[in-house]
């Protein structure tokens, strides 16, 4: 049962947060901690293959004890993926919507979906109570202090009465067109060069597979531009980053 929310946001009484997950343990723990006081039910969806099609073991329950604080609020889901590298990504993203239904949201309840490292904040709640919108997130790349010059349209949400009828992959595809409010963080390609190489070998877009991540970290750059060291780390980010 979802707990009732006292003095909720707009007309919604509960909030369901959905994310894709590959193997980003630290990112998932950061997400759950950052959103703990805002979310009633978390939905975490893992595929049986990387987006590039390599078989992978189910990992979500391997370190279950580390997530005991949220065990009564997490819907862990495993989905079997097929097709090409982009179709596998689409299938996993659409699966979030199907799994969100297991939380039984009401028409006015807020439902959000993201990649695991896209973490929104409470500034979105009033907007999401009324309409579908995207969080414009402060984007940090390679290290939590290194900021990209443009923010990232990441987490998408809205009232379930609107989200239920949408194709979530199509919403993701047109996220640059959605109403946007600055909110939260997108911390991507974290954890060092080895973690970056593992991610590059797994994601749908193959263009990062030959990137020299050691060189990028040494020169404080991303592939297409320099990164600015802004001297602050978002609250609660893992020390390993």
Please state what every model-predicted region is.
Residues 36-88:
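Acidic donor-binding segment of Leloir-type glycosyltransferases
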Residues 2-4, 78, 83-101, 109, ...:
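Catalytic-site signature of metal-activated, phosphate-bearing donor transferases
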Residues 38, 106-107:
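Short loop/turn motifs at secondary-structure junctions
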């Amino acid at each position: 049962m979802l707990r009732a929310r006292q003095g909720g946001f707009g007309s919604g009484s509960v909030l369901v947060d959905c994310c894709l997950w590959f193997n980003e343990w630290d990112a998932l723990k950061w997400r759950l901690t950052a959103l703990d006081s805002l979310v009633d039910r978390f939905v975490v969806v893992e595929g049986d293959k990387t987006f590039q099609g390599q078989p992978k073991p189910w990992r979500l329950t391997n370190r279950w004890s580390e997530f005991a604080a949220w065990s009564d609020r997490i819907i862990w889901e495993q989905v079997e993926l097929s097709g090409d590298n982009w179709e596998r990504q689409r299938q996993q993203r659409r699966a979030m919507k199907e799994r969100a239904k297991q939380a039984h949201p009401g028409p006015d309840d807020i439902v959000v979906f993201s990649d695991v490292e896209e973490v929104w904040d409470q500034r979105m709640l009033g907007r999401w109570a009324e309409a579908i919108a995207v969080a414009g997130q402060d984007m940090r790349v390679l290290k939590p202090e290194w900021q990209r010059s443009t923010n990232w349209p990441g987490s998408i949400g809205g009232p379930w009465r609107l989200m239920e009828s949408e194709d979530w992959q199509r919403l993701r595809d047109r996220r640059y067109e959605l109403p946007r409010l600055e909110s939260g963080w997108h911390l991507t390609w974290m954890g060092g060069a080895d973690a970056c190489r593992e991610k590059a070998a797994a994601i749908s877009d193959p263009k990062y597979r030959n990137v020299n991540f050691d060189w990028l970290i040494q020169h404080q750059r991303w592939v297409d531009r320099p990164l600015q060291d802004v001297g602050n780390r978002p609250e609660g980010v893992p020390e390993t980053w």
